Amino acid sequence: MVTLTASYEELTESSAVALAIRLGLIQESSHLTCTEIGDGNLNYVFHIFDHKQEKGLIIKQALPYAKVVGESWPLTLDRARIESAALIKQSEYTPHLVPAVYYSDTALAVTAMEDLSHLEIVRKGLIAGKQYPHLSDHVGEFLGKTLFYTSDFATNPKIKKQFVKQFTNPDLCDITEKLVFTDPFFDSSTNDFEEELREAAEALWADLEVQAKAAELKRIFLTSAETLVHGDLHTGSIFASETETKIIDPEFAFYGPFGFDIGHFIANLFLNALSRENEHDQQHLFDHVVNVWATFKEVFAKAWKEDSIEAFSVSDSFLETTFDRILKEATGFAGCELVRRTIGLAHAADLDAIPSPSKRIQQKKTALTLGKTFIKQYHAVETASDLVALFQQSVKE
C-alpha cells in the first residue's frame, strides 16, 4: 500500500510507533517497544515489537543526507520509493528471499516491512566465525531469477523501458560511480585509509593498466541497462540463519549490468576470507564463491529455456557467451569493490576488525593486490574457480 502524507519529517521512536498503530500494522499496547537499530549510513531503521503478541515490525525511513558525512551531503528521498518498489518486484520471483513490504509512503520516505530480527546480518556472523550452509544457494537463486526476469530476455522491450524509467536512481548511482569506480583510483578527498597503506595506494593510482581497465568497468556500469540490479549486494545487506536467507536494502537498485551484484557479493566473501587465519578456515567461503556462480547459472539457464522471449535464445552458444561475459564483468566489478572497501569511503568491517594492527595492514595490502589482479585480468577469467586461484595467488605474493 502506498499513501502520500503532507510533508517529510524525521521519525523518532515514539512517532514511528504512532505511525504503525495509525496504519493498523500493530495494535496499541503497553507491551510495545521501539528501538532505532540502523547501523548504515543513509537511514533510520526502527524495530517495533509487541512482547505480548510476539509480533514485530520494521519501519525504515530514508534521511535527506548521508549519516556518514552529515547534512553537507544531501540525498534524494526518492530512494525510499526505489527500495520499496524493488522489494515488491523482487518478491514476484523470490518471495521467500526478500522481506515482505506492508506499507510505503513517498512523502515520509518510509517503508514498513517484515521483521527479520530472528536472523542475523551475514557480515557480522561471518566475522564471528559462523557459517551459513545455504547462503550461496539462496543468493544464487535470487540473482538467477531476479536478474533474468527483469531483463530483456523475459520482459517485453517496451515494458522493460518503463521499468528502466521507474528505477532511474541518479543520486545513489552517483555515489557508486564516485565511491566504487572513481575516487579509489585517484588521490581523492573521500578516500580513507591508514598511512601504512599510502605506498600501496599510490602504486595503485600510478598503475596505468589498472586505470584503463577501471575506466572500462566504469563505462559498463554507466551504460549497460540490462536488468534490475540490487545495486549494493554485500554481506551487510543479507540476513540469514543456517536455513533461511533474506536480501534487504535495495535502495541502490537501478537498471544496470548483469555482473554487478554478482561481483559485489563475491568481493565481500573474499574480504571475509582475508580475515581468516588459514586456508582451512577460508574453504567454506571459497565454496560459496564457486557455488553462487554455479547456482546462478543453473537457475538462469532454466529460466532461459522455459521463459525467454528472445528469439535468439534457441542458441546454446548465445547462452554460453552471455554467461562468459557476465562472469568476466563480475570479476572486474569485484576488483573495484575490493579496492573501494580497502582504501575508499565505507570500509568492510571484516578487515577493520582484525585485532592485530600489523596483520590488518598486511591483509589490506593483499586486498588491494587481489583487487588489482581482478581488474587487470577480468577478461581472462573463465570459471569461478579461477577467482579462488587468483585469491590464493595474491595471498602468497
Swiss-Prot record:
GO terms for biological process: L-methionine salvage from methylthioadenosine. Keywords: Amino-acid biosynthesis, ATP-binding, Kinase, Methionine biosynthesis, Nucleotide-binding, Transferase. GO terms for molecular function: ATP binding; S-methyl-5-thioribose kinase activity. SUPFAM superfamilies: Protein kinase-like (PK-like) (SSF56112). The keyword Nucleotide-binding applies. ATP binds at N43, K60, E114, D115, L116, D249, P250, E251. Pathway: Amino-acid biosynthesis; L-methionine biosynthesis via salvage pathway; S-methyl-5-thio-alpha-D-ribose 1-phosphate from S-methyl-5'-thioadenosine (hydrolase route): step 2/2. It catalyses: 5-(methylsulfanyl)-D-ribose + ATP = 5-(methylsulfanyl)-alpha-D-ribose 1-phosphate + ADP + H(+). It comes from the Bacteria. InterPro entries: Aminoglycoside_PTrfase (IPR002575), Kinase-like_dom_sf (IPR011009), Methylthioribose_kinase (IPR009212). Substrate binds at D232, R340. The keyword Nucleotide-binding applies. Its EC number is 2.7.1.100. Belongs to the methylthioribose kinase family. Homodimer. Catalyzes the phosphorylation of methylthioribose into methylthioribose-1-phosphate. This is Methylthioribose kinase. The gene is mtnK.
